[in-house]
């Protein structure tokens, strides 16, 4: 069975939003970044991570949030990536279209997902190795 380990939301100011969630819920910060593509903060409760991201407006992506801010996707840690993907596809999941940006250029995050899928209009990631739940020393 897959386990939800990552939830990603978008916010106008991820740095301010992260401070609010840290104060309100006692979440711990794992990392943050400010690259040419996005401002981002990664929080955790030690079990599930919360990614708070704001993609920057670029020539290629002048309006990254046509529908506003909020839930973007969730990530599931699975034991067997291939069988989990096959099971999801059998249920109707399809590949997400490629993002409009090169995610490898993000400053504050290692790319933990291995498969990006959509099911019933909801985006989710699958990962066989999971997400970091503590700050790297």
Q: Over which residues does each language-model region extend?
A:
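Conserved beta-strand in the GNAT
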Residues: 51-53, 125
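A cross-kingdom feature marking solvent-exposed beta-strand/loop segments within repeated
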Residues: 59-61
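A generic structural micro-feature
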Residues: 44, 65-68
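Vicinal oxygen chelate
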Residues: 76, 85-137
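Core segments of cupin and vicinal oxygen chelate
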Residues: 2, 9-50, 90, 98, ...
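N-terminal beta-strand motif that seeds the catalytic metal site of vicinal oxygen chelate
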Residues: 1-18, 71-78, 127-137
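Short, conserved charged micro-motifs
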Residues: 16, 81-86
């Amino acid at each position: 069975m897959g386990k939800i380990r990552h939830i990603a939301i978008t916010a106008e100011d991820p740095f301010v939003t992260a401070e609010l969630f840290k104060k309100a819920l006692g979440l711990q910060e794992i990392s943050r970044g400010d690259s040419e593509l996005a401002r981002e903060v990664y929080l955790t409760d030690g079990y599930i991570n919360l990614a708070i991201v704001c993609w920057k407006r670029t020539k290629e992506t002048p309006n990254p949030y046509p529908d506003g801010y909020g839930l973007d996707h969730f990530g599931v840690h699975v034991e067997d990536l291939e069988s989990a993907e096959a099971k999801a596809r059998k249920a109707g999941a399809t590949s997400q279209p490629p993002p409009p940006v090169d995610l490898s250029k993000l400053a504050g995050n290692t790319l933990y997902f291995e498969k990006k899928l959509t099911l019933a209009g909801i985006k989710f990631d699958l990962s066989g190795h999971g997400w970091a739940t503590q700050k790297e020393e």
